[in-house]
Each structure stands twice: as structure tokens, then as C-alpha cells.
Amino acid sequence: MILRAALLLVLTGLLAGCVSSGTVDPLKTDEGRQQARDAYIQLGIGYLQQGAAARAKTPLRKALEIDPRSADAHAALALVFQTEMENDLADKHYREALSSRKDA
């Protein structure tokens, strides 16, 4: 019985050691920021595809907070404004998207 209790304690300790402490903020790494930006862009595009253009703005703006030069975020936001007939804002974001392209 004592052996079982000791074994259970050791296994519990080992498992607890395998759990990440979660102290690393994923937005502090380039990879984490890119993943967050891409997730926000996909969420915004999803809302736009569902016809929720106004709702798409929030995640797309968050993507731009993470990466203000994201061509994809600017292009998606331009589509949102175009859908809402906000032509000046759409034009602004289309131009930002074009100037932000890495291969331009």
C-alpha cells in the first residue's frame, strides 16, 4: 500500500513537471505575433463571407495592431469598406495593401 502511494506521488510529480507554466506570452515572439495576426485576418474574412461586414472590422483592426504593414489585413479591410460603400476608406486600405506587399 505504501509503495502504491509513493508511486502515485512520483507519477503526479512527474506529470506536474510536464505541464507548461504558461509564463511565455505568445505575442512576444515573432512566430506568435504572425499566428495571431493570421488568425485575426481569417476571422475577419470569415465574418465578411457570412455577410457580417461590420463585425469583420474588429478582428481585422486587431491584426493591424499586431502588424500595421500587413498587406492581407489591409486588403481584407478594404473589402469590408467596399462592401459598406465606404469608397474612400476602401481605397485607402487597398493602397496600403499594395504598398505593404513584400514582393512590390
Regions found by a protein language model. Give the residues of each.
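Bacterial Sec signal peptide processing site at the extreme N-terminus
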Residues: 15-35
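Structural marker of alpha-solenoid helical repeat scaffolds
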Residues: 32, 66, 99-101
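Residue-level recognition of tetratricopeptide repeat
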Residues: 36, 70, 103-104
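Register position in tetratricopeptide repeats
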Residues: 49, 83-84
